UniProtKB/Swiss-Prot annotation:
Residues 20-102 form the GST N-terminal domain. PROSITE patterns: GST_CTER (PS50405), GST_NTER (PS50404). Keywords: Oxidoreductase. The active site is at residue 30. This is Pyrimidodiazepine synthase. Disruption phenotype: Sepia eye color, due to defects in 2-amino-6-acetyl-3,7,8,9-tetrahydro-3H-pyrimido(4,5-b)[1,4]diazepin-4-one (pyrimidodiazepine or PDA) synthesis, a key intermediate in red eye pigment drosopterin biosynthesis. GO terms for cellular component: cytoplasm. GO terms for molecular function: glutathione dehydrogenase (ascorbate) activity; glutathione transferase activity; protein homodimerization activity; pyrimidodiazepine synthase activity. The gene is se. Belongs to the GST superfamily. Omega family. Gene3D superfamilies: 1.20.1050.10, Glutaredoxin. It catalyses: 2-amino-6-acetyl-3,7,8,9-tetrahydro-3H-pyrimido[4,5-b][1,4]diazepin-4-one + glutathione disulfide + H2O = 6-pyruvoyl-5,6,7,8-tetrahydropterin + 2 glutathione.
Length: 243
């Protein structure tokens, strides 16, 4: 197991115990991989984390996962064993396969409504990436307006009710990066708490969630990773003490 260090080309296959526990191929700074960590931690599902250098991937990764993508979940107890990709599909599988602490609503209509809101968030994260690259901030704020209204309509502390649910976790990685966006944009950053009163409270509640806390990363660390990536030398091991 990588123990937090990102494995690169030439790295041997990690010595993971043959214990039947799920193996998650991940990257510490990837918001899509973060979704899967959040679900695994929220549901308290045991798993091994294997972090991958996506710039210089280890050769054996393509044997496990021909797409070479993260997140990828290896289900070692199944024949094969199969490797699942795509964060939303992995998270849905986990919620169905491990029914304790359900994250998707049990009601079919509410489940579909949450899925639609997760799908709709694709446009919001697209606007986020453009804003973080110096683009107009307003499309991102306009996208968040939808979730501000929805949280107000539900009248609950979280989108999942009185505890976190799937919608909370699927949009969180980009909401966590609001502080990163603030660093990137400086004086241009114009998040308005009066425009987002419900989301502002939700952000603070989410920061106290155990699953969120387990994978939370300070904006300054995220910014430093992006700085090294912009120089063509991404430091994937910023969080490794002896990196």
């Amino acid at each position: 197991m990588s123990n937090g260090r990102h494995l690169a080309k030439g790295s041997p296959m990690p010595d993971v115990p043959e214990d039947g526990i799920l193996r998650l191929y991940s990257m510490r700074f990837c918001p899509f991989a973060q979704r899967v960590h959040l679900v695994l931690d929220a549901k308290q599902i045991p798993y091994h984390s294997i972090y991958i250098n996506l710039t210089d991937k280890p050769e054996w990764l393509l044997e496990k996962n021909p797409q070479g993508k993260v997140p990828a979940l290896e289900i070692v107890r199944e024949p094969g064993p199969p490797v699942l990709t795509e964060s939303l599909l992995i998270c849905e599988y986990l919620d169905e396969q491990y029914p304790l602490r359900p994250l998707y609503p049990r009601d079919p209509l509410k489940k579909v409504q949450d899925k639609l809101l997760i799908e709709r968030f694709r446009a919001v994260l697209g606007a986020f990436f453009k804003a973080s690259d110096g683009g107009d901030l307003e499309p991102f704020w306009s996208g968040l307006d939808i979730y501000e209204r929805e949280l107000a309509r539900r009248g609950t502390e979280f989108f999942g009710g009185e505890q976190t649910g799937i919608l909370d976790y699927m949009i969180w990685p980009w909401c966590e990066r609001l502080e990163l966006l603030k660093l990137q944009r400086g004086e241009d950053y114009n998040y308005d708490q009066s425009r987002f009163p419900q989301l502002t409270l939700w952000l603070e509640r989410m920061k106290r969630d155990p699953a969120v806390m387990a994978f939370y990363m300070e904006a300054e660390v995220q910014a430093e990773f992006l700085r090294t990536r912009s120089l063509g030398r991404p430091n994937y091991n910023l969080l490794v003490k002896d990196a």
